[in-house]
Amino acid sequence: MCGLVGYVGQRPACGVVMDALRRMEYRGYDSSGIALINGSAKSGNLTVRRRAGRLSNLESVLAEMVPASLAGNVGLGHIRWATHGRPTDRNAHPHRDATGKIAVVHNGIIENFPSLRHELEIAGVEFVSDTDTEVAVHLVAQAYCAGETAGDFVGSVLAVLRRLQGHFTLVFANADEPGTIVAARRSTPLVLGIGDGEMFVGSDVAAFIEHTRQAVELGQDQAVVITADGYRISDFDGNDDAVNARTFHIDWDLAAAEKGGYEYFMLKEIAEQPDAVVDTLLGHFTGGRIVLDEQRLSDQELREIDKVFVVACGTAYHSGLLAKYTIEHWTRLPVEVELASEFRYRDPVLDRSTLVVAISQSGETADTLEAVRHAKEQKAKVLAICNTNGSQIPRECDAVLYTRAGPEIGVASTKTFLAQVAANYLLGLALAQARGTKYPDEVQREYRELEAMPDLVARVIAGMGPVADLAYRFAQSTTVLFLGRHVGYPVALEGALKLKELAYMHAEGFAAGELKHGPIALIEENLPVIVVMPSPKGSAMLHAKLLSNIREIQTRGAVTIVIAEEGDDTVRLYADHLIELPAVSTLLQPLLSTIPLQVFAASVAQARGYDVDKPRNLAKSVTVE
């Protein structure tokens, strides 16, 4: 997601902070900003500059300023990936309070910001941005000016932290206490850098790796107060809590630091998938209802929908295939899933009661954008599922669900796919809620089950070592087949696509029931076949049929690699290699069963000596038809 840095020390903060932002550009961003405090030990002046677009835009603004206004030994910096509010100058960080004394930079999502903003507006606070971040700085200023924590900067920040809900990292500076920075984290990362007469905080060690190799990783719900001379770690109540932080020495070089210690960005992004799902879900269940990020459609209009089309390309298309199962099951609406590149050329039947769902990571995919425009011309209602706030597709749609996966550097999609799948569930529940096909308590129960998935995603990722070993064993195979049924079929398609993209191998995904209608002719001795097994609890019939398929291919000499839920002992007899996953409900299985296929493809590519992040002939955002 966003990248942030804080510095207090003896050097000019402007140069230190800007260097840190340049080192964090790899994270991806749509705007940037800096806050500097120049003054004595008792009071100072706060200067803030921020710009949408590339970091060079901010550099140009700073170059035009009087050097004296850039002086100061305390600074905050931020590169933003928009989640609340479009990527504009006024939504860029840092944000200030009304007095212009307190500044904040923020990574993550403040889930209860609508109610907090309403409270502040009633109190007369005027907001200048559309972000959730601005709520935090106004609350701190309010606490600092009056009440029990009046005049106590650290106490004011802690009091506000206790009120915030969500996942966030926040870093505050105050011109009235110019030698102090207060930072805190809940779930999103925050690392402290310990220098000689200077201190740093950052989203990751890339923010300060050129200046110090001594670091402290803050724990959950911890705050830190830093000055040039030292630091103090506490919980949100102000109690000493250094024991729950982790001190470590940074052995990586800068390139490794950018990748979080992983060899490739894609491996880092696979590891980030629990956070991608958490952040996509945050803030979408409020007051007992599923809410969209942007909604220009009334519940009445949603109730009038009588059919749904999902349009997408590549990996997003596979997430759309999964959306079909969810939406049809929960809403009883018919759903068609179309490749965006084919959609507008076949003259689909669309009208005012049609909902077209456009899924795109970048929000700029040319084929998907043209499909959206065709749907709008036919008076259909259009909803976007997108990872990039302010991109073209969301701007042209009637409603938007943002996948808050953050920037994805690897060309092959991983965390954005899981975030899209999570967003599809939210959409299905929102439609079921509007149409009355699920009672409120049923919607809440489904959402709570979805909310528990990130921990299981993390558990699966932690156990992927054997899958990587398996990949090296089959790295020289010429063909790999993938089989699945029901929601396992789109997962099989996605697994095959990943192997094609990354390892340049022939790979095909099939619905297992089609095996006897042709693909079984491909089965030969030692051919690896990966099977995505449904839960025996979800559908005993589907499970039995897929077991029969496995027996068919095994008797013809294929090597079976079976992905099945823990406790499914019936499959052990027919699996040459078994990958076990936690048991979840059928519709949620793709959030787990996709992960081994991502790891398998990346590991095969590594074993074959290919660049996992930059597969040949592919681009991250396809903006031509």
From Swiss-Prot:
The residues responsible for catalysis, as annotated, are: C2, K620
EC number(s) reported in the record: 2.6.1.16
Q: What is its main location?
A: cytoplasm
Q: Does the keyword Phosphoprotein apply?
A: no
Q: What GO terms fall under cellular component here?
A: cytosol
What NCBIfam families does the annotation carry? Answer: glmS, PRK00331.1
Subunit info here reads: Homodimer.
* HAMAP family with a match to the protein in the record: GlmS
The protein's name in its UniProt record: Glutamine--fructose-6-phosphate aminotransferase [isomerizing]
Protein encoded by which gene: glmS
